[in-house]
Amino acid sequence: MARLCAFLMVLAVLSYWPTCSLGCDLPQTHNLRNKRALTLLVQMRRLSPLSCLKDRKDFGFPQEKVDAQQIKKAQAIPVLSELTQQILNIFTSKDSSAAWNTTLLDSFCNDLHQQLNDLQGCLMQQVGVQEFPLTQEDALLAVRKYFHRITVYLREKKHSPCAWEVVRAEVWRALSSSANVLGRLREEK
């Protein structure tokens, strides 16, 4: 019995081993959820991207503001948290549920909720440790403006199937970018 308890304790510790040196401890499952969310986004595709070429739009993803090379490790958490929250806002809207397979959408949103909880846990660890530098505020504002452009686009296109397909592909790009940021920061460890 003692060995079983020791084994379970080791498993618990390993599952919360930091995934990167961000000034906080993200559980290993955070990266797995991110990969799963990307996979779910691919599975959610309902239309061929070729059929929606006329609806494509450059939303101006703020790559330079989100790039791990440009922001410090501790600044990455609020930016990634904002990015995740904004994606969740789009996919939990009432108009979103009509556009997607409900099972895939629910799984996707659940993964995002868990990622957001991980990131917010890190934010709580950072409270009082650092003030938000101006570059971080710029990055947060750039992320908010980016998602505002996406929301306006969906409204202008009346949440059409092609508009949702364009947004799905764009969100995949944003989530991929956040995974790349975490990967680069982990390499700096």
Swiss-Prot record:
Residues of the signal peptide: 1-23
Glycosites: 101
Compartment list: Secreted
GO BP term (any one): defense response to virus
Subunit structure: Interacts with CR2.
Family classification: Belongs to the alpha/beta interferon family.
Protein name: Interferon alpha-1
Organism of origin: Mus musculus (Mouse)
Organism placement in taxonomy: Eukaryota, Metazoa, Chordata, Craniata, Vertebrata
